[in-house]
């Protein structure tokens, strides 16, 4: 490789930095410097012994935005690259690459806005992102990079979907098993169907339906979040608390549709319990615990009109106080329980929503709440509802209690029905007060004439002929009433979860097609693996049919339905009936599909036989109990990304991975052993008097106020982005300062897990540090080495060894800001101590120490020191423990609490010795002459205080 600094100034300028960076990036590319070998398969290296120690480091799957990157985006990428480079220097085999999560709503919306096909815009965006990240010198293994939009990738997304589809969850074994094993058990009568029938007694069609009730993927007519403005349905997690779409902020309505669902609820306990095995931030664990929402209580049946209304309650001890039942307006029993006749004359008019007929009242009420979010429905101060005209029986006292629908009850939690105990629940109390319903005290301790009493207390008014819980505490009453409910056949103990099954379909174009076809009768059939991938057809009209955002009555019309030649196919599925006409599913998978398993494809990206060879997976993500303890779940060693993915991506990925583990395809129980949430780089933005954002770079500050074109503007602090006109491109910083400068600056800004403000004016500080580093090794006039062969002094050895020890510990613990601080401190020491040339033995290790965070300049210095090849795999410097302990320490000496001098004392000196040295100090002796020292205080290693009079 040619010397990048030939025929140019020898000062470390942005121009020289650019030459050095370009040359070394080309060297890394040409030599496959960051290629990590696998144990087996296409990426294995024959004749090479695989390092026993490995490190699998991963960034969260980025979406390739059309807007390109701003300087906030690379923060995590630089951090993981720094950590990866450090671990390579420890002799570990490091897997570090970056792919692109390119399917989904954002890419499609961008394509629609620009009028360009999403494949074209996506490929262009990926290329631009690769270009921008390439400037930073990130040490990725390019052979392992994938995009979720590559057919070679989504072939395996479809394959995994089929594995999940063809599986069921065995409650006894608490694991997924192939559906073929269930069929065998059903055929011999070892198991019955969900409703207790024998499989052999069923018709073929009934058998298919019975199996679908077990599958981990199933079609369901269920209430979904319909967003007319986007023309698609959304998962609960994609809807904001205000009832708007996360993408585009459009209104979202509740609607019954037939959709693919994934039975993630089967894994509720494992998803919850296995959080304890993970090295994750407690905040993220808490968010997942709350989302899964496990609670213990009882399921109780209220008989009504030939049906059982099942309700879940954590307080079955209050059953005697249940005065009415409330169903969610979308509950499946509402229409069946509606009275077919008009309301009786004596029905309270407050119960009828202004109508004489229950059916009309329910229809009007449903329409009135269609646009309300779940949060609005739960927090709504005004309690509303409709009486169905029918009654349910309270199972503990036989009382006939009215059945209502009300928006504060949701289908997404529990059974979608509640027993209302107004005396002891605030919302029930408010509802009962508004509607004039009875309020019966069953827990002593409060004044229910004023408000609901929601604390624990002794049971009162709670007895029948065979049950008496009066006088019992809450726990005792619950322990007594549940067995009674079970004996009577009207209830049972139950654990309930907030977690709902995962809505797994979108009415869009830009997503993975389902490997499913339907016959003329609408029956679904999985396609054989030999037909994968089912490629997304190229269509001219890829736009979804969107509607007026407020049109709640609209229905989805997927764009793929327009591709008739693709939809209608002649296939022989090997069912014994020969070729038939089938119809492809015109929905696509949600944008979370590819990111639910991509970490496994990074391991084996070119394998055509399987998504990831088990031996390769075991090496890179398998449990390592000797290193991480007996309960190590395995997984990626370090996963870095934002906390915003705590519930969505991370929960879905854990679910998919656990199914693959149960089926024997992976050895690790969890996808990610360690999670680290990086903070964000934020910036100031400015708005004029109209509230319009103005370019931040053109705003001037005068006397604490901010001006744009002479007009005063308002300053606000938060995100960085093009829409806020405060975006700074990494391209510009790399051009004006150099990539290493950008890397050092971003790592120095503060702890990695906290957010920090961007300030372009401060970047020069990182540049000056690298210039001082360069001058320690290179003569700026001649370009030759400026170091000497002098031996290191004791002081040099202390500074060097302490820097090595401190920097190593900081790298290991991702304290990258203090890494930079320690390196700056050491460079400053050498600069001051050796203005005319520092010893080579002091500077050469510095190139190794700085290499993870500023790799280009480190490579160049290493080469200038006469080394061949790359610094990447040079061993990280070792330190000598003896230089980490001081022989002497400096101790401040106070007189009456004020520091008057500082003295050097032996590090292990006792109080008498230290005080004696302090008193002998010339300055202290002068100040205490002729005075009485009445007290001597010594805080070991910290200070001496002499109290004198």
UniProtKB/Swiss-Prot annotation:
Choose any GO biological process term that the UniProt entry carries and state it.
leucyl-tRNA aminoacylation
Q: Which UniProt keywords apply?
A: Aminoacyl-tRNA synthetase, ATP-binding, Cytoplasm, Ligase, Nucleotide-binding, Protein biosynthesis
Enzyme class, spelled out? ligase
Which Pfam families does this entry report, sorted A to Z? Answer: Anticodon_1, tRNA-synt_1_2, tRNA-synt_1g
Please report, in chain numbering, the residue ranges of the motif 'HIGH' region: 62-73
- For region Disordered, the annotated ranges are 542-561
Q: Where in the cell is it found?
A: Cytoplasm
Question: Which reaction(s) does its UniProt entry say it catalyses?
Answer: tRNA(Leu) + L-leucine + ATP = L-leucyl-tRNA(Leu) + AMP + diphosphate
User: Gene3D superfamilies from the xrefs?
Assistant: HUPs, Isoleucyl-tRNA Synthetase, Domain 1
Q: One GO cellular component from the entry?
A: cytosol
Which positions in this protein are listed as binding ATP?
A: 722
InterPro entries from the entry? aa-tRNA-synth_I_CS, Leu-tRNA-ligase, Leu_tRNA-synth_edit, M/V/L/I-tRNA-synth_anticd-bd, Methionyl/Leucyl_tRNA_Synth, Rossmann-like_a/b/a_fold, tRNAsynth_Ia_anticodon-bd, Val/Leu/Ile-tRNA-synth_edit
The record, for HAMAP family, names: Leu_tRNA_synth_B (MF_00049_B)
Instruction: Identify this protein by name.
Output: Leucine--tRNA ligase
Whichever gene encodes this chain, its name is: leuS
């Amino acid at each position: 490789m040619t010397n990048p600094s030939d025929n140019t100034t020898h000062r470390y300028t942005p121009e020289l930095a650019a030459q050095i960076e370009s040359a070394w990036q080309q060297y890394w590319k040409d030599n496959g410097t960051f290629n990590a070998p696998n144990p087996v398969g296409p990426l294995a290296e024959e004749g090479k012994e695989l390092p026993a120690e490995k490190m699998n480091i991963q960034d969260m799957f980025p979406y390739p935005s059309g807007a390109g990157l701003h300087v906030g985006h690379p923060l995590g990428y630089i951090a993981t690259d720094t950590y990866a480079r450090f671990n390579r220097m420890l002799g570990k085999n490091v897997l570090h690459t970056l792919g692109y999560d390119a399917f989904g709503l954002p890419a499609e919306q961008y394509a629609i806005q620009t009028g360009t096909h999403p494949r074209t815009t996506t490929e262009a965006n990926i290329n631009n992102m690769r270009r921008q990240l390439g400037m930073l010198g990130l040490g990725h293994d390019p052979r392992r990079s994938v995009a979720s939009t590559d057919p070679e990738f989504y072939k395996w997304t479809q394959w995994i979907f089929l594995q999940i589809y063809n599986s069921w969850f065995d409650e006894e074994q608490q694991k997924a098993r192939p559906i073929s094993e269930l069929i065998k058990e059903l055929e011999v009568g070892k198991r019955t169907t969900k409703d207790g029938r024998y499989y052999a007694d069923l018709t073929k069609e009934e058998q298919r339906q019975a199996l679908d009730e077990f599958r981990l993927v199933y079609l369901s007519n269920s209430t979904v979040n319909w967003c007319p403005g986007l023309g698609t349905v959304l998962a609960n997690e994609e809807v904001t608390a205000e009832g708007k779409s996360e993408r585009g902020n459009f209104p979202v309505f509740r609607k019954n549709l037939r959709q693919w669902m994934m039975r993630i609820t089967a894994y509720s306990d494992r998803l919850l319990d296995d959080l304890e095995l993970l090295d994750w931030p407690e905040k993220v664990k808490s968010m997942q615990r709350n989302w899964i929402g496990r609670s213990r209580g009882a399921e109780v049946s209220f008989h009504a009109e030939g049906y059982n209304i099942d309700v879940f309650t954590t307080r079955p001890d209050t059953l005697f106080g249940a005065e009415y039942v409330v169903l969610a307006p979308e509950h499946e029993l509402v229409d069946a329980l509606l009275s077919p006749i008009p309301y009786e004359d004596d029905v309270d008019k407050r119960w009828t929503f202004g109508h004489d007929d229950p059916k009309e009242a329910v229809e009007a009420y449903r329409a009135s709440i269609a646009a309300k979010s779940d949060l609005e429905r739960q927090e709504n101060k005004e309690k509303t509802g409709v009486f169905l005209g029918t009654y349910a029986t309270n199972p503990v006292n036989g009382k006939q209690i009215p059945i209502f629908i009300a928006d504060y009850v949701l289908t997404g939690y529990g059974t979608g029905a509640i027993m209302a105990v107004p005396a002891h629940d605030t919302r029930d109390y408010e509802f009962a007060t508004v509607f004039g319903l009875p309020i019966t005290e069953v827990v002593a301790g409060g004044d229910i004439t004023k408000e609901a009493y929601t604390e624990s207390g002794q049971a009162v008014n709670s007895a029948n002929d065979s049950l008496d819980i009066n006088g019992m505490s809450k726990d005792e009453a619950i322990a007594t009433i549940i067995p009674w409910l079970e004996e009577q056949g009207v209830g049972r103990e139950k654990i309930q979860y907030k977690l709902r099954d995962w809505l797994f379909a979108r009415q869009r174009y830009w997503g993975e097609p389902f490997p499913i076809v339907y016959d003329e009768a609408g029956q679904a059939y999985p396609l054989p693996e030999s037909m994968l991938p089912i490629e997304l057809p190229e269509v001219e009209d890829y736009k979804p049919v969107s509607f007026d955002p407020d049109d709640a009555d609209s229905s989805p019309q997927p764009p793929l339905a327009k591709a008739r030649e693709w939809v209608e196919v002649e296939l022989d599925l090997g069912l014994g009936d020969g070729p038939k006409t089938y119809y492809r599913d015109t929905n696509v998978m949600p944008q979370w599909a590819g990111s639910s398993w991509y970490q496994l494809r990074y391991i084996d990206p070119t394998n055509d036989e399987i998504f990831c060879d088990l031996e390769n997976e075991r090496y890179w993500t398998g449990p390592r109990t000797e290193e991480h303890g007996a309960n190590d779940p395995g997984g990626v060693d370090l996963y870095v990304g934002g906390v915003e993915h705590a519930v969505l991506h991370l929960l879905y990925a854990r679910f998919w991975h656990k199914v693959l583990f149960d089926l024997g395809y992976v050895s690790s129980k969890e996808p990610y052993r360690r999670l680290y949430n990086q903070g964000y780089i934020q910036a100031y933005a400015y708005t004029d008097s109209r509230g319009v954002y103005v370019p931040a770079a053109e705003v001037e500050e005068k006397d604490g106020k901010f001006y744009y074109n002479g007009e005063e503007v308002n300053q606000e602090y938060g995100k960085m982005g093009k829409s806020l006109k405060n975006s700074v491109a990494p391209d510009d910083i790399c051009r004006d300062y150099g990539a290493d400068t950008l890397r050092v600056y971003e790592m120095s800004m503060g702890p990695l897990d906290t957010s920090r403000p961007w300030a372009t004016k401060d970047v020069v500080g990182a540049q000056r540090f690298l210039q001082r580093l360069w001058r320690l090794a290179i003569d700026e006039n001649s370009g030759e080495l400026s170091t000497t062969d002098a031996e290191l002094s004791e002081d040099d050895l202390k500074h060097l060894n302490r820097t090595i020890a401190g920097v190593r510990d900081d790298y290991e613990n991702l304290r990258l800001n203090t890494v930079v601080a320690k390196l700056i401190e050491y460079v400053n020491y050498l600069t001051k101590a050796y203005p005319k040339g520092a010893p080579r033995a002091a500077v050469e290790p510095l190139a190794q120490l700085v290499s993870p965070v500023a790799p280009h300049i480190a490579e160049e210095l290493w080469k200038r020191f006469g080394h061949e090849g790359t610094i990447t795999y040079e061993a990280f410097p070792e330190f000598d423990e003896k230089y980490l302990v001081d022989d002497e320490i400096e101790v401040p000496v106070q007189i009456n609490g004020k520091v008057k001098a500082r003295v050097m004392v032996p590090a292990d000196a006792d109080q008498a010795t230290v005080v004696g040295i302090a008193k002998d100090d010339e300055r202290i002796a002068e100040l205490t002459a002729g005075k009485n020292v009445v007290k001597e205080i010594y805080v070991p290693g910290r200070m001496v205080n002499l109290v004198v009079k």
